[in-house]
């Protein structure tokens, strides 16, 4: 998954395609039709901005488009949400409100969010649609999400065919919240501004104080439980609960800052075998990228600059490429002057063995690994990334 227009939507929502029980088609009530029309009207007005974002070639261009989108969103969404709520409040007990309430919960107004979550809890706590709504926000960082998932998890009315989803989502939620303090510390100026704008400065201050060790320990326990109980349950086609649990457990146990980076053994884009440990003694920036990922390609110019800047110093850029068709990559490499080596993830692309083992759920994903092979940074971008690299390159030079 690539970065989108706001931090809250750059996080994995793996249940969007999960199979739901098929229900007979029922004509929606008039209020639900009106709410859907309000939503479609806003989306239509923002569509040109989304297209501009997809076409942007540099991080600076994307930052400008994000800034523009936030200004437009501030104009369009609040009145649209209020119009929708005037239709939804009187009908809150009707299951047909779930889709509309789920949409309104994207509001950045904490009071409105809590009102919506309160209505969902009161009337539709364990409906499949509400469970999917909560599961898809498991990694969103919203203040209410952990409480909602815990309430669903503990409910005696939780349907058996939905239990796996809540179990997995709660594990994901706790893992994500455990990572937030480090992620905020490494956030670029652009991402930091977006975090403040999406969640509010008070909420971001709370996130920075999360007890990462406690949250991580509980998430690890939940991942082990759900992986053992529902190993073959399909989350989306080609991805099972067992696979997700295994990747997440591996990330928690082996991919934290301060831990030795696991070995990667694979082939580069020319088919030659190599290992991550081949670069021991140098600081490594490990970049998970793909040509289908706009933000990944937007980073290429800066990555070229880093390669040139550190040419005579102990630094190496190593990629992990997620394109399923290696043959088409030759033109991409030549056009973008990509000279550094990349592991190829295989013909399954982002679901290949390396990205799956490293639990990569957002593209690009960047690691800074020091000369001793220890992970020193995850997901840093912009000036923060540059500072991390310079810090550890200097330390590597000092040891020589």
Where in the sequence are the language-model features?
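N-proximal helix/coil linker or "cap" segments that precede and/or mark the start of modular domains
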Residues: 193-269, 277-280, 331-334
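Short pre-active-site segment immediately N-terminal to redox-active cysteine/selenocysteine motifs
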Residues: 282-284, 289-292, 362
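Conserved helix-turn-beta segment immediately C-terminal to the redox Cys motif
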Residues: 300-320
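Thiol-based oxidoreductase modules, predominantly thioredoxin-like and allied folds used
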Residues: 313-328, 338-349
């Amino acid at each position: 998954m690539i970065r989108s227009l706001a931090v809250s939507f750059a996080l994995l929502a793996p249940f969007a395609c999960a199979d739901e029980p098929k229900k007979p088609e029922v004509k929606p009530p008039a209020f639900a039709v009106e709410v859907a029309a309000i939503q479609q009207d806003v989306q239509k007005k923002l569509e040109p901005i989304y297209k501009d974002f997809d076409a942007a070639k540099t991080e600076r261009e994307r930052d400008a488009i994000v800034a523009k989108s936030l200004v437009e969103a501030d104009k369009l969404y609040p009145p649209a949400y209020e119009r929708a709520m005037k239709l939804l409040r009187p009908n809150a007990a009707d299951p047909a409100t779930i889709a509309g309430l789920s949409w309104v919960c994207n509001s950045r107004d904490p009071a409105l969010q809590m009102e919506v979550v309160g209505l969902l809890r009161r009337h539709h706590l364990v409906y499949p649609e509400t469970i999917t709504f909560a599961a898809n926000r498991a990694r969103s960082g919203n203040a209410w999400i952990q409480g909602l998932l815990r309430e669903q998890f503990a409910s005696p009315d939780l349907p058996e065919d939905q239990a796996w989803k809540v179990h997995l989502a709660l594990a994901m939620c706790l893992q994500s919240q455990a990572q937030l303090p480090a992620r905020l510390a490494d956030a670029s100026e652009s991402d930091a501004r977006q975090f403040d704008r999406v969640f509010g400065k008070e909420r971001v201050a709370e996130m920075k104080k999360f007890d990462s060790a406690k949250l991580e320990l509980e998430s690890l326990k939940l991942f082990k439980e759900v992986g053992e109980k529902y190993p073959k349950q399909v989350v989306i086609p080609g991805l099972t609960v067992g696979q997700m649990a295994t990747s997440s457990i591996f990330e928690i146990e082996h991919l934290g800052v301060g831990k030795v980076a696991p070995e990667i053994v694979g082939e580069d884009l020319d088919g030659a075998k190599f290992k991550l440990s081949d670069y021991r003694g140098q600081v490594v920036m490990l970049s998970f990228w793909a040509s289908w990922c706009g933000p990944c390609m937007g980073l290429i110019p800066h990555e070229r600059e880093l390669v040139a800047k550190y040419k005579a110093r102990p630094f190496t850029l190593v990629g992990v490429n997620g394109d399923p068709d290696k043959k088409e990559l030759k033109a991409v490499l030549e056009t973008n002057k990509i000279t550094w080596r990349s592991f190829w993830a295989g013909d399954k692309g982002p679901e290949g063995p390396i990205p799956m083992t490293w639990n990569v759920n957002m593209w690009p994903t960047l690691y800074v690994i020091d000369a001793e092979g220890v992970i020193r940074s995850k997901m840093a971008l912009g000036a923060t990334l540059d500072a991390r690299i310079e810090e550890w390159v200097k330390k590597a030079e000092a040891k020589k």
